[in-house]
């Protein structure tokens, strides 16, 4: 037996290496360096939202009831934005507004900035998690790139838009009915549905749903090797490693249907990635434009003719009148501190009335 005498080549690990080993260890739920950002931020964002929707009123900021404690349900409860008078204050618990008083902080809308900022960083942490895991198992980072779409929409709607306006007050509150109110606000004040970036976003999201349905149906339709079950679901074997559908058959089918078809899987799946992500990014760019009060399409000639000719009206001019109605009613209700009063004779009416 030979015994080697000398200094061991195994150096003691430093703090960074020890942390790296522990964070990236193979476990049921991967943590990773990204988890240091993801898990605390996601915990605080969700915890803040559940706390706000359960206990916290919006009486002091919006004049509304917004919690389960006040009688709201899942669809009407919300964590509401701070008051318009607080502008873009971060509303830190220890800041000059709340001065360390937790109850006062909740009343002022501090939970909204808390949830919005932790939510944004939590989403970024989730994207970094996908980068980190992809690198660990030697995958391309397209999952993380795809997730940049939802992040862009969240950041543009909840952070960039109110930063371009007079305060956090004009961002969406975190609730189902609150988001619906925000959509109506966007339509009335920005004519959002006629914005080309919104159109591209709708085309991307609905187009992606169509592609997903077509792709799933085509793969199911072209299975050439299945199990012995009576139907696809009974015959499905999740441990089967080999591919059992025919790309050639699918290509021939869609070539006959449309005259064109995807010739390889890489282009097909890249297209399924490209359509929704591009749509979401276009929507986000459009919202950034709205933050700067950029206008959508204006067909002024139709508006002038409709004003001059009582018998001329288009769907566009009717929608413009609807937008005026939304502004007239919503501004007075949504901003009571402005004391807006509109006389009956200035409220919009269609030419048919």
Swiss-Prot record:
Photosystem II (PSII) is a light-driven water:plastoquinone oxidoreductase that uses light energy to abstract electrons from H(2)O, generating O(2) and a proton gradient subsequently used for ATP formation. It consists of a core antenna complex that captures photons, and an electron transfer chain that converts photonic excitation into a charge separation. The D1/D2 (PsbA/PsbD) reaction center heterodimer binds P680, the primary electron donor of PSII as well as several subsequent electron acceptors. D2 is needed for assembly of a stable PSII complex. It comes from Marchantia polymorpha. This is Photosystem II D2 protein. The D1/D2 heterodimer binds P680, chlorophylls that are the primary electron donor of PSII, and subsequent electron acceptors. It shares a non-heme iron and each subunit binds pheophytin, quinone, additional chlorophylls, carotenoids and lipids. There is also a Cl(-1) ion associated with D1 and D2, which is required for oxygen evolution. The PSII complex binds additional chlorophylls, carotenoids and specific lipids. It is a multi-pass membrane protein. 2 of the reaction center chlorophylls (ChlD1 and ChlD2) are entirely coordinated by water. PROSITE patterns: REACTION_CENTER. Fe cation binds at residues 215, 269. InterPro entries: D1/D2 (IPR055266), Photo_II_D1/D2_sf (IPR036854), Photo_RC_L/M (IPR000484), Photo_RC_L/M_CS (IPR055265), PSII_PsbD/D2 (IPR005868). The chain crosses the membrane at residues 41-61, 125-141, 153-166, 208-228, 279-295. It is found in: Plastid, Chloroplast thylakoid membrane. GO terms for cellular component: chloroplast thylakoid membrane; photosystem II. Pheophytin a binds at residues 130, 143. The modification N-acetylthreonine is found at residue 2. Chlorophyll a PD2 binds at residue 198.
